[in-house]
């Protein structure tokens, strides 16, 4: 703001000089001394006005500083009152926290006493549970010994198992052979894929070479365009340089103007130095006031530091309380762990009891199946064909086939139910923390058992005259010639007609004429034959 006023004053001086010059021109009678006196008067008059303006401005600043000093004093007094109130509040809160800490210590002592009492009670319960577990363990060991003695009677079942294992080995050999064929097939496929990859790589290299040649052609065509662009850029640079030179000339002119203004400012600086000395004296007084304020601020900082120390003490007390609470929580977690261990032990005892009952049921079922199978085998072995007439051999074969089918159904149901139960029990017994290798072994064994069951289920009963050594062909029923049927009996003619319509042998209607024998129940749905006893088969539980 000050330089603008001075520029106005310079303009006024120039106008006054012009007026004086005009007066000189108009009044030629006045002497030059009177003109100089008038000019000095005007100059001093303007200087006095300038100084009066400055004095008014400094007076306003002094009033503003006085108002600010009053405000600072009021704020300082308010801060002192706030400090007193804060100290009183902190003292009250500290007393409250001390009371709370004493209450918490009392509660902690009571909790420790209760914890010790609960610990003693749980230890007594643990001892009782261990005693009960030992008793149940002894009972289970005795029962296992009794079951081991009973298992010695299953030697005949072991022989049948050996026969099944031999069949299983034959199937495994067949499976290995098929695996070898599959590996050869995979090798051929991999070889073919490698050859295809080489062919594709060669094609890609050829395409890359073609693209490179095309790129070179395009690059040669673009060289002319780049030179034209460089010429245009040079023209633009020359134009910019001309503009910069013009701007330099303008800056030199402005520099000369600034030098003229600098001389004027030097004159004003001399005038301001006097005022600076006056302001320095005032600043000394202000510095004394500032020192007083700094001492008061230091006192306030000391008060705040004391308050922070009190806060730190409170924080430490809160940390101690938190550590005590954490110790209490750890004790509770230990108690919960002991409870969980008790539950797990009880669950394991129940599981062992359930497994024992399942094993007993399975063994009873196997015994019943074995007794039924032995009775069926005895009946089959005791059957004897009557050799009086050739027609009775058909009935004997039908009866024998029925009994063999019943025996096969009985044994297959037992074989299917037993592995399913074993698999279910094995899945229940598997712990959650098994390694990956053991899980893979268990999965492979399950898959092998499932494949064996599927193979057993696909086995079909043999038809009479078909032992299964030769693969079956499509049955094409060719009607017999009447010339071939003439020498045959009535019974054989009816049997051939039935065979043309069905794949299995059913009793013909002509057999009902004979009164010397009776067919079995599944074919005639009448009374049981006197020669062959059909055993009652009990249902096998799943």
From Swiss-Prot:
Name of the gene: Cfap157
Single GO BP term: sperm axoneme assembly
Region called Disordered, residue ranges: 1-32
Main function: Specifically required during spermatogenesis for flagellum morphogenesis and sperm motility. May be required to suppress the formation of supernumerary axonemes and ensure a correct ultrastructure.
Cell inner membrane is among the record's keywords: no
Coiled-coil segments on the chain, per record: 33-192, 250-370
Positions where Phosphothreonine occurs in the chain: 31
UniProt-recorded Gene Ontology molecular function terms: microtubule binding
Transport in keyword set: no
Subunit structure: Interacts with TUBB and TUBA4A. Interacts with CEP350.
Family: Belongs to the CFAP157 family.
Chief place of localization: cytoplasm
Source species: Rattus norvegicus (Rat)
GO cellular component assignments: ciliary basal body; cytoplasm
UniProt feature, compositional bias: Basic and acidic residues: 10-27
UniProt keyword terms in alphabetical order: Cell projection, Cilium, Coiled coil, Cytoplasm, Cytoskeleton, Differentiation, Phosphoprotein, Spermatogenesis
Official protein name in the record: Cilia- and flagella-associated protein 157
Annotated localization: Cytoplasm, Cytoskeleton, Cilium basal body
Record-annotated disulphide pairs: none
């Amino acid at each position: 703001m000050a330089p603008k006023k001075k520029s106005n004053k310079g303009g006024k001086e120039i106008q006054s000089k012009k007026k004086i010059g005009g007066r000189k021109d108009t009044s030629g009678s006045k002497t030059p001394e009177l003109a100089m006196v008038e000019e000095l008067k005007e100059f001093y008059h303007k200087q006095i006005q300038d100084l009066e303006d400055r004095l008014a401005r400094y007076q306003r600043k002094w009033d503003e500083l006085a108002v600010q000093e009053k405000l600072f004093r009021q704020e300082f007094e308010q801060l002192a009152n706030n400090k007193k109130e804060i100290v009183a509040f902190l003292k009250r809160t500290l007393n409250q926290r001390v009371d709370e800490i004493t209450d918490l210590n009392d509660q902690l002592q009571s909790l420790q006493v209760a914890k010790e009492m609960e610990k003693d009670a749980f230890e007594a319960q643990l001892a009782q549970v261990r005693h009960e577990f030992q008793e149940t363990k002894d009972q289970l060991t005795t029962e296992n010994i009794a079951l081991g003695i009973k298992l010695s009677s299953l030697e005949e079942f072991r022989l049948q198992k050996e026969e099944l294992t031999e069949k299983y080995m034959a199937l495994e050999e067949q499976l290995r052979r098929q695996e070898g064929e599959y590996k050869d097939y995979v090798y051929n496929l991999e070889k073919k894929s490698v050859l295809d990859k080489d062919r594709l790589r060669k094609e890609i290299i050829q395409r890359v070479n073609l693209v490179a040649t095309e790129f070179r052609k395009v690059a040669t065509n673009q060289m002319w365009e780049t030179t034209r662009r460089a010429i245009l850029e040079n023209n633009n640079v020359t134009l910019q340089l001309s503009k910069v030179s013009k701007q330099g000339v303008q800056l030199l002119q402005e520099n000369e103007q600034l030098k003229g203004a600098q001389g004027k400012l030097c004159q004003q600086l001399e005038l301001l130095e006097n005022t600076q000395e006056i302001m320095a004296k005032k600043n000394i007084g202000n510095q004394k006031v500032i020192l007083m304020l700094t001492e008061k601020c230091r006192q306030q900082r000391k008060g705040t530091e004391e308050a922070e120390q009190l806060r730190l003490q409170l924080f430490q007390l809160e940390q101690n309380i938190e550590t005590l609470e954490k110790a209490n929580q750890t004790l509770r977690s230990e108690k919960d762990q002991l409870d969980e261990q008790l539950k797990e032990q009880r669950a394991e005892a129940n599981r062992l009891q359930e497994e024992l009952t399942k094993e007993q049921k399975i063994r009873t079922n196997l015994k019943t199946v074995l007794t039924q199978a032995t009775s069926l085998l005895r009946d089959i072995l005791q059957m004897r064909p009557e050799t009086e007439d050739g027609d009775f051999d058909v009935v004997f074969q039908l009866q024998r086939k029925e009994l063999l089918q019943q025996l096969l159904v009985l044994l297959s149901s037992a074989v299917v139910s037993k592995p399913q139960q074993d698999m279910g029990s094995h899945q229940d017994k598997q712990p959650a923390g098994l390694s990956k290798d053991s899980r893979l072994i268990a999965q492979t064994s399950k898959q092998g058992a499932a494949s064996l069951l599927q193979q057993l289920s696909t086995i079909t009963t043999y038809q009479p005259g078909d032992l299964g050594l030769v693969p079956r062909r499509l049955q094409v029923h060719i009607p017999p010639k009447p010339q071939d049927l003439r020498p045959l009996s009535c019974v054989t003619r009816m049997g051939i007609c039935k065979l043309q319509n069905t794949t299995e042998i059913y009793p013909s209607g002509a057999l009902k004429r004979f009164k010397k024998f009776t067919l079995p129940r599944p074919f005639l749905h009448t009374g049981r034959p006197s020669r062959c006893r059909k055993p009652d088969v009990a249902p096998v539980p799943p």
